[in-house]
Each structure stands twice: as C-alpha cells, then as structure tokens.
C-alpha cells in the first residue's frame, strides 16, 4: 500500500534550501520515492492553518518511506534542511 509524506516548510535561507533540494531528489528517487508536489500554489479550505511551502512525496509502502526517512544518508541531508528551514511533517498510508 502506498505511503505519503507531507511537509509544511518555512524556509529562511533559500539558497541553502535549494542546495538541500538538489541533493535530496536523487536520494529520494533511488529509494523508490517520487515527488507529488514541491512548493506549488496551495489553498487553505478549513481552519487557521497557514502553510508556507508544501512538499509531498510518495513511496510504494510505509516501510520504504521510513527506510528512506530514517536512513543515515537522508538524516545527513536533513541536517542541512534543519539549518535553513523549520517545518512540520506527517506520513500517511494510502487506501
């Protein structure tokens, strides 16, 4: 069953964040993931949520998503992301 990660990211160093994105894309794809959304236009329909940048990606399973997310390689790249942005993230299984 497919699994999805959804991030709401507040970027405060765009140049550094772009460096992170360039490095993480091939790692994500090599692990079986694919981007579904990366910072496109979005609209809030309910609540007082004010997302900055929405990033979504899909993996074939939650197991593969977690293998990617908790891998040493991604965690090293995540430290770059943490230096230039803050955010929230969730993972959810598809139907």
Predicted regions and their residues:
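C-terminal structural segments of small proteins and small subunits
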Residues: 62-90
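Short S/T/G/P-rich N-terminal loop/turn motif that feeds into the first structured element of a domain
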Residues: 1-54, 59-70, 93-95
